Amino acid sequence: MIEIKHLKTLQALRNSGSLAAAAAVLHQTQSALSHQFSDLEQRLGFRLFVRKSQPLRFTPQGEVLLQLANQVLPQISRALQACNEPQQTRLRIAIECHSCIQWLTPALENFRASWPQVEMDFTSGVTFDPQPALQQGELDLVMTSDILPRSGLHYSPMFDFEVRLVLAPDHPLASKTQITPEDLASETLLIYPVQRSRLDVWRHFLQPAGISPLLKSVDNTLLLIQMVAARMGIAALPHWVVESVERQGLVVTKTLGDGLWSRLYAAVRDGDQRQAVTEAFIRSTRDHACDHLPFVRSAERPIFDAPTAKPGSQPRL
C-alpha cells in the first residue's frame, strides 16, 4: 500500500533531481532514503526510477505515481488548510442585559481587528429573552447571567460583578452604612423592562425577605441614572456601569446586604464552544472586559476577593 509520505518522497526526488539532494530536502541520510525506496519497490513489485541515471529518469510506473502525487498532495494541502480555517464566517450575537452594550461594542471592534473575515451580526436593541433563539439556531452567542438547566447550551464564564444600590446623593438611604431589604420596601425601584424574576436584586435580595417595592421600567441606562439622580427612584446596577457618574458626585452607590455579586456568561450551543471563531471571541471579549471595566474580576478569582477600580478605567454610558 502506498502512503502519502511515499508520494511526498517521489515528488521531492523529481524536484531535486537526485537521491542525495532529495535526502537533504527531506532531512534524511541518502542511505536511509535509498533503503526506503528499495522497501517500497519490493512491496509494489516494480522499480520507480533508474538508479544512477543522469539526469534522473523515472520508470513508467514511477511516472504514474508522480502524476498521482501531483493530483493528491495539493488536494490534501487544501483540505488541511480548510480544516484550520474558521468554519464560522458569521457570528450572530445578542445580550440579555442593557448595561452590557456599553463594553461589548468596543470589545466587538477589538475582536474584528484580529478576525476581519468574520461577519459580526449584533442584534439591534436589547433582547431580553434570546436563549430560545440560540437553542433554535437563530443566534450563535448570547451574553447572559441566567443559566437554563438541561437546555443543551454551554455557558462560558466571562467575569463577576457586584450589583450595587444606586441613589441620589441626598437620598435618606445614602447615609446608611448597610442596606437591608426592608430599607427598600417603600421605595420605587427603577428596572429594565424585564420580568422581576430575572433580576438579581429581586431573586437574591428582596424576594427571600418577602419585600416587594414598587417597580418602574426604564429602557435606557442613561435615562435611568438621570432619574435616580433626580430622586425619581432608586436602582440596582452593576458597579462598573455607574462608576464614572459616581465619581462626578451625581449618584452614590451602596452595598446590598453583605454584597450582591453576579456572573456574566457567554452562552452557545453545546459543542460550539470549540469552534475556532467562538472560542476566540469569548477569550477576546473576556480579556477586554477584565482589562478595561472597573470593579469586575475574572470569574476564576475567589468570590470574596473584592476587586478595585482600575486607574483610568471608565465605563461608557
UniProtKB/Swiss-Prot annotation:
Residues 19-38 bind DNA. One of its GO terms (molecular function) is DNA-binding transcription factor activity. InterPro entries: LysR_subst-bd, MetR_PBP2, Tscrpt_reg_HTH_LysR, WH-like_DNA-bd_sf, WH_DNA-bd_sf. PROSITE patterns: HTH_LYSR. Keywords: Activator, Amino-acid biosynthesis, Cytoplasm, DNA-binding, Methionine biosynthesis, Repressor, Transcription, Transcription regulation. Residues 1-59 form the HTH lysR-type domain. The keyword rRNA-binding does not apply. Signal peptide: none annotated. One of its GO terms (cellular component) is cytoplasm. Belongs to the LysR transcriptional regulatory family. Control of the last step in methionine biosynthesis; MetR is a positive activator of the metA, metE and metH genes. It is also a negative regulator of its own expression. This is HTH-type transcriptional regulator MetR. The gene is metR.
